[in-house]
Curated annotation (Swiss-Prot):
PANTHER family: VWFA DOMAIN-CONTAINING PROTEIN (PTHR22588:SF3). The lineage of its organism: Eukaryota, Metazoa, Chordata, Craniata, Vertebrata. This is Collagen alpha-2(VI) chain. The gene is Col6a2. Residues 574-584 have a biased composition (Pro residues). Residues 1-25 form the signal peptide. It comes from Mus musculus (Mouse).
Length: 1034
């Protein structure tokens, strides 16, 4: 109750004050207009000065970057896409009108532009008006050469930086297909990023459907849903202008310009003055004042007592090892060793390789007629051809279905609050207004309150190890430590300075004199007095002996003690260096004459000498000769070809020339084969390897020259290139009685500015022209006629292809060999000796081949299938035995090994091809560990010595290991010893770069020539490896 009564006073005062404030406000509202003007004359003026701000000016510059390279300008019909761009851009800018956007910003538009190929031309500088820009746009002409998009972007950025001032919103519309032929200016990504740093917003628009989407995305700003969004100049499957692209880009431009220029400002209207406030309550007690100045410095303290002697220090660490002693004296010469035991017999050597042919023997007498032979086995399966190169991109597919409707736009900001108006009467429902413009994106909302706890989630997988955290904050101060031991007595301190004299206090008021009081009680003891030193007293009596003092510190080192007894014998030292050889002794007495030695090897015959010469020099091989022949290849190096297809053209030239035999060593001689090459693009870029080039005097030098040709990536001037080839190569260096062939490769139409009459520039009675057209366009009548014109109207000399990869097909290379060299001469040297085989083939001796396949996880499922096909191809290639006890021909077996207890015999030693192929189809991949030692032991025990007959008695036993050598070493030495006992001839096929050569050398019994290294399992099917492998095992 007391508290309530205490609060009634202040609450009553506040309540009364509030009522007075309301009355004062009502009184202010009741004042007449004249009085109001007299009371506050500045209110209306303030309102007039704080109306809505003026509409902001927003100048916008739009820059167009147009691609007129060959890949765009040469689309059928020529320059059709350029003409389309010249219609698209004016229609685009015609819809960019100066206006008040959303009644808040005043948009005004200016324009600029350039077009590019492998060079850049600015046709309209930034800031141009619509009329001058449109006039300049209609006057551009395409370059039809390479595509350097990065240089165009760099030039565009420089133009805008130089000609456009601050406060201008910059947009760029880049119309290109996204393909590039070079990046001499740093690349698209770098130049597009520099443009964005300058505040330029880039839109990427495709002129056709043959586009590189990734290149367009590299150009466009983020997000791509705004600046790329499948923009195109023409509608799908039509030549009409895509109006939807124009509308969407303009909508984004206006919205972005509005967001850049519009500045939100609050509407400020001053209100009337409020009522006078009430007197505040008495303030609370103030905080404690600042501490006073320090007092006078105290006197020096008494010296402390001397502390105890410290504890002994830790034991010292052992000293460093002494230096090595001097070399000892030379030891005595050792006694001669005992005689060694007899060595064990060496292992049986592997069969030798096929030797060179021996001397031809005398003709033998005719033998008896043989028995009629049985029907022959099916023929061998042909080699699998090499995988062709990837084809050109397919034609554009049908247009996709319309996309889903876009999401609703963001709601705009609320407008500024208006001034309160006069309350009107209730009106009727008005007509429905038009749909408003989409508002700009709203400001971020306030942070929401914490939501309710969700259900407990499942325990997540352990995440990856996070980065090292930042250094922790400095920890709080620790607790006060225990009191330390007394320190040693310190030196006497200096005398302190006298303190400053304090100020005198104010005198107090004199009070009335009081009566004498009663004696008070006894006071408290006074505070201790100051311990000033008194005068020295008289000496006291001698005291009693004190307690024993603390233990003293460690004393100084004593004198050196007497020497100790002799130590134990040390470890033996390293042997000293060998002594210098002594002087040469006197010459001994000649020994008795020895016994005759064993007969020597027979001397080398003439055939043996010739064999060594052929093996060492390789100069006795047969060679192919095509007679006096000149071949000129004319290859297309324009942008439309592409780098990959240009490489295929060069490979085609090299592969064909490989089939023509040796090249003339002297290009000026009247005989032999000479080869020239012309690569062409636009005018002035032709490059040639001439027929009479003295540097091209061998096949290897010609290959090197072809490989050094670089892709020009420009326009296509085919007629001028044919004229250049005839005048500069054929006409200038023609030889008498020499056949001349020309092979022309092109991908289609040439630049219309070139002269069509030059298509027949090679049509000479002594020149045979083969025209190779690659692409679908040659099915058209006009382009087919151009190809026939190049081939001098000879249809049999025209070759049509769909893909460039068909150039390097083996069948087509054979066809070109027959065209260029129809009647070759095979010239072999006359040898005095013929040869025969040292070792018979697999058809003339028994061979049992056991394949041991590493089925570990390093092999992989896909490579396992490739190995199965390899074993199957070997079974088809070899001549297999007719029965298990056949004394000739081969049998095969396959064992897949994994861990120590995982060995799988796919099929034992057999001659039946059907059994081999069915077993290979059933074989499964172990996907286990690798223990080659247990695999070898299992093969010997279960395949070589198997219950089903095992290896033949007099057959050569061959083990073929398919492994990388990364395996367990358990029982490896034992298994290698077992191979030696069984006279196994090993062969190792190691695939990949990660191999264990130590293990491979052991299982090959030390014969490194028996180890075949290949880069991948696809190489097992290549003829270069497969034929070599078959010759080795046979």
């Amino acid at each position: 109750m007391t508290t309530i009564k205490m609060l009634q006073g202040p609450l009553s005062v506040l309540l009364i004050g509030g009522l007075l404030g309301v009355l004062h406000a009502q009184q202010q509202e009741a004042i007449s207009p004249q009085e109001q003007e007299a009371v506050s004359p500045d209110i209306s003026t303030t309102e007039r000065n704080n109306n809505c701000p003026e509409k902001a000016d927003c100048p916008v510059n739009v820059y167009f970057v147009l691609d007129t390279s060959e890949s765009v300008a040469m689309q059928s019909p020529t320059d059709s896409l350029l003409y389309h761009m010249q219609q698209f851009v004016p229609q685009f800018i015609s819809q960019l009108q100066n206006e008040f956007y959303l009644d808040q910003v005043a948009l005004s538009w200016r324009y600029g532009g350039l077009h590019f190929s492998d060079q850049v031309e600015v046709f309209s500088p930034p800031g141009s008006d619509r009329a001058s820009f449109t006039k300049s746009l209609q006057g551009i002409r395409s370059f039809r050469r390479g595509t350097f998009t990065d240089c165009a972007l760099a030039n565009m950025t420089q133009q805008i930086r130089q000609h456009v001032g601050k406060g201008v919103v910059n947009f760029a519309v880049v119309i290109t297909d996204g393909h590039v032929t070079g990046s001499p200016c740093g690349g698209i990504k770098m130049q597009a990023e520099r443009a964005r740093e300058e505040g330029i917003r880039l839109f990427a628009v495709a002129p056709n459907r043959n586009l590189n989407e990734q290149g367009l995305r590299d150009i466009a700003n983020s997000p791509h849903e705004l600046y790329r969004n499948n923009y195109a100049t023409m509608r799908p499957d039509s030549t009409e202008i895509d109006q939807d692209t124009i509308n969407r880009i303009i909508k984004v431009m206006k919205h972005e310009a509005y967001g850049e220029c519009y500045k939100v400002s609050c509407l400020e209207i001053p209100g009337p003055h409020g009522p006078k406030g009430y007197r505040g309550q008495k303030g609370a007690k103030g905080n404690m004042g600042e501490p006073g100045e320090p007092g006078q410095k105290g006197r020096q303290g008494d010296p402390g007592i001397e502390g105890p002697i410290g504890f002994p220090g830790p034991k010292g660490v052992p000293g460093f090892k002494g230096e090595k002693g001097e070399f000892g004296s030379d030891g005595r010469k050792g006694a001669p060793g005992l005689a060694g035991k007899n060595g064990t017999d060496g292992q049986k050597g592997k069969l030798g390789r096929i030797g060179p042919p021996g001397c031809k023997g005398d003709p033998g007498s005719r033998g008896p007629d043989g028995y009629p032979g049985e029907a022959g086995s099916p023929g061998e399966r042909g080699d699998q051809g090499a995988k062709g190169d990837s084809g050109r991109p397919g034609r554009r597919g049908p247009p996709g279905d319309p996309g889903d409707k876009g999401s609703k736009g963001y709601q705009g900001n609320n407008g500024a609050p208006g001034s309160p108006g006069v309350k009107g009467g209730k009106g009727g429902p008005g007509p429905r207004g038009p749909k408003g413009e989409p508002g700009r994106r709203g400001d971020p909302g306030t942070k929401g309150g914490p939501g309710s706890d969700g259900p407990k989630g499942e325990k997540g997988d352990p995440g990856p190890e996070g980065p090292r955290g930042l250094a922790g904050e400095v920890g709080s101060k620790g607790a006060k430590g225990d009191r330390g031991l007394p320190g040693p007595r310190g030196p006497q301190g200096a005398l302190g300075e006298p303190g400053k004299q304090g100020s005198r206090g104010d005198p107090g008021d004199a009070g009335p004199r009081g009566d004498s009081g009663q004696p008070g009680p006894k006071g408290d003891p006074g505070r201790p007095g100051f311990s000033y030193p008194g005068p020295r007293g008289t000496p006291g009596e001698k005291g009693e002996p004190g307690p024993p003092g603390p233990e003293g510190g460690r004393g100084d080192f004593g004198l050196k003690g007497t020497p100790g007894r002799k130590g134990d014998k040390g470890e033996p030292a390293d042997p000293g260096p060998p002594g210098e050889p002594g002087p040469r002794g006197p010459r001994g007495i000649p020994g008795p004459e020895g016994e005759p030695g064993p007969p020597g090897d027979p001397g080398l015959t003439e055939c043996d000498v010739m064999t060594y010469v052929r093996e060492t020099c390789g100069c006795c091989d047969c060679e192919k000769r095509c007679g006096a022949l000149d071949v000129v290849f004319v290859i297309d190096s324009s942008e439309s070809i592409g780098y990959t297809n240009f490489t295929l053209e060069k490979n085609f030239v090299i592969n064909v020339v490989n089939r023509l035999g040796a090249i003339a060593k002297d290009p000026k001689s009247e005989t032999g084969t000479r080869v020239g090459v012309v690569q062409y693009s636009h005018e002035g870029t032709f490059e040639a390897i001439r027929l009479d080039d003295e540097r091209v005097n061998s096949l290897s030098s010609f290959k090197e020259a072809v490989k050094n040709l670089e892709w020009i990536a420009g326009g296509t001037w085919t007629p001028s290139a044919l004229k250049f080839a005839y005048n500069q190569l054929i006409k200038e260096s023609r030889r008498q009685k020499t056949r001349v062939f020309a092979v022309v490769i092109t991908d289609g139409r040439h630049d219309p500015r070139d002269d069509d009459l030059n298509l027949r520039a090679l049509c000479d009675r002594d020149v045979t022209v083969t025209a190779i057209g690659i692409g679908d366009m040659f099915h058209e009548t006009h382009e087919s006629e151009n190809l026939y014109s190049i081939a001098c109207d000879k249809p049999q000399q025209v070759r049509n292809m769909t893909l460039f990869s068909d150039l390097v097909a083996e069948k087509f290379i054979d066809d070109m060999e027959d065209v260029l060299c129809p009647d070759p001469q095979i010239v072999c040297p006359e040898l005095p000796c013929q040869t025969e085989l040292y070792v018979a083939q697999c058809t003339q001796r028994p061979v049992d081949i056991v394949f041991l396949l590493d089925g570990s996880e390093r092999l992989g499922e896909q490579n396992f299938h490739k190995v199965r096909r390899f074993v199957e191809d070997v079974s088809r290639r070899l001549t297999l035995a007719r029965r298990d006890d056949d004394p000739l021909n081969a049998r095969m077996a396959l064992l897949q090994y994994g861990s120590q207890n995982q060995q799988q015999v796919a099929f034992p030693l057999t001659y039946n091809v059907t059994t081999i192929h069915e077993a290979l189809e059933r074989a499964t991949y172990l996907n286990s560990f690798s223990h080659v030692g247990t695999g070898i032991v299992h093969a010997i025990n279960n395949v070589v010595r198997g219950a089903r007959g095992g290896a033949r008695r007099h057959a050569e036993l061959s083990f073929v290991f398919l492994t990388d050598g990364v395996t367990g070493n358990d029982s490896l030495e034992e298994s290698v010893h077992s191979m030696r006992k069984q006279n196994v001839v090993p062969t190792v096929v190691a695939v990949g770069g990660d191999v264990d050569m130590d293990v491979l050398t052991k299982i090959s019994l030390g014969d490194r020539a028996a180890i075949f290294r290949e880069k991948d399992f696809d190489s097992l099917a290549q003829p270069s490896f497969f034929d070599r492998f078959i010759r080795w095992i046979c």
